Amino acid sequence: MRPNILFIMSDDHASKAISAYGHGLNQTPNLDRIAQGGMRMDHCYVTNSICTPSRAAILTGTYNHVNGVTTLDTHIDNRWPNVAKHLRQSGYQTAMVGKWHLGEGKPHEPTGFDYWSVLPGQGEYFDPVMIEMGKERTESGYATDIITDKSLDWLNNRDYDRPFFLMCHHKAPHRNFEPHPRDRDMFNKKDIKVPNTYNDDYKNRARAAEAARMRVRIDTKYSDLGLVQPEGGAEVGDLCFEGSTERRIPHPEDPRGLVLIDRHTGENFTFETQEQLAHFKYQRYMKRYLATIHAIDENVGRMLDWLDEEGLAENTIVIYTSDQGFFLGDHGWF
């Protein structure tokens, strides 16, 4: 009997934030079930580690200079052969649910799938619009839960006489990190260990390391950390890029006049030193990131439980991966 294939992918999930890897940052018991029951990849690298090119490479099995999807802004030509097309031709039922990020419209929408329901672009964490078989519809709830609900709904309504191939793609934990309200406070009782290289001065490193605009200390946005962005211009923070309305949180030498406000609770945060501010940014970033991952682990557990209940676990290949990893404060980066 040919095996079913369940392919689950998240976005920007660092291996350090999976407890099966032993780093102690968080607990992911359901992801660990996959590792314990199969193979854990310890040396797996992305050749073009940004969302769109990585997804194109996974889908087509080709390098980006071959499939043409070389940047975040290039879209896939959906006439390309892909894994779903090959499997469907051999008798599999195929479905794609969640983050696509390879372009919208007829030339770029998913092909090779009997059913698809995808987020446009990055999509939203709460009440996301989804494009289902070419038609937009707004779904109520939290994206990680919704993507799992829709995946399970398709599985329950498929043809049970044929094997299935399901690509379940989560938006989480991509910036801006938005944990479900049930998870927002789960890491608040203790601090996350700061990496030894968090304050890297980049001496004796390549110039690109110092130039990279992804430092937790100076490049995090208000929205990254669940903070209110004040009204105003450059005095409340530099624009993230030309044309953006989002601003970076300031990192002044003397932060005693800086007040940051929690977007959810209204709590105010003040700082006496620059190092205290840097520590706050790291803790806030990490706790929101890890809390966002918690919902992924819970929902992976729902899918594994479904396989057990249906008696399909032994004949289903389950793969969990991310489109790329993430820096968790290592060398000061996110």
Q: What is the predicted role of each segment?
A:
Residues 1-334:
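Formylglycine-dependent sulfatase
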